[in-house]
């Protein structure tokens, strides 16, 4: 359980990141990077939380996939989705990551067997400060998915979600060149 100070620090940092991205103070610097390495960095960030809940994170990828991405900001975007997957998946659940290659882009699917997102809320979840009804009582401020979409869009990519009562799949479409 987070202390009040930790929650306030998290909120402040999230607001600063959002403000800097929106105002253009920080610009993304895409360069040829390994998506695999970015994913592994994000997994390391949420690993302790997943372990606490006995959640298994799977990412079996024998091929290295490269794309024009800002390493740190893309890791931030993936971490936001992974953090939500761990947060909304019950103990003993599974969070999976899979990369699929297409001619001009890579698709990263992040799936979970969590509580799911009602269909009527799916179009709203990327809005600033939006929190769904099912997130009541679960820590969060409604900035993570908003930031994630902004980060991915600024790199000429996009994000989609498919969800039902058995879990969610967030798909990030990332330009290779």
Regions found by a protein language model. Name each.
Residues 85-86:
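Short helix-loop "hinge" at the ATP-lid/N-box region of the Bergerat-fold HATPase_c
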Residues 112:
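Acidic ATP/Mg2+-coordinating residue in the GHKL
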Residues 3-8:
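Short alpha-helical segment of the dimerization/phosphotransfer core of two-component systems
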Residues 29-34, 51, 56-66:
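Conserved catalytic submotifs in the C-terminal HATPase_c
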Residues 156-161:
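Conserved glycine-rich
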Residues 117-129:
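Short conserved segment of the HATPase_c
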Residues 40-52:
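Short alpha-helical segment within the cytosolic histidine kinase core of two-component systems
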């Amino acid at each position: 359980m987070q202390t009040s100070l930790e929650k306030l620090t998290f909120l402040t940092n999230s607001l600063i990141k959002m403000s800097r991205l929106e105002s253009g103070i920080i610009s993304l610097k895409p360069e040829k990077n390994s998506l695999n390495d970015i994913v592994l960095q994000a997994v390391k960030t949420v690993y302790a939380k997943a372990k606490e809940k006995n959640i298994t994170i799977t990412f079996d990828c024998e091929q290295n996939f490269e794309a024009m991405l800002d390493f740190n900001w893309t890791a931030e975007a993936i971490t936001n989705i992974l953090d939500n997957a761990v947060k909304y998946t019950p103990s003993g659940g599974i969070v999976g990551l899979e990369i699929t290659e297409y001619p001009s882009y890579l698709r990263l699917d992040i799936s979970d067997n969590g509580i799911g997102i009602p269909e009527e809320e799916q179009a709203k979840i990327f809005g600033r400060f939006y929190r769904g009804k099912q997130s009541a009582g679960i820590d969060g401020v409604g900035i993570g998915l908003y930031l994630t979409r902004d980060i991915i869009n600024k790199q000429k990519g996009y994000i989609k979600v498919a969800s039902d009562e058995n879990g969610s799949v967030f798909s990030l479409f990332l330009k290779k060149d």
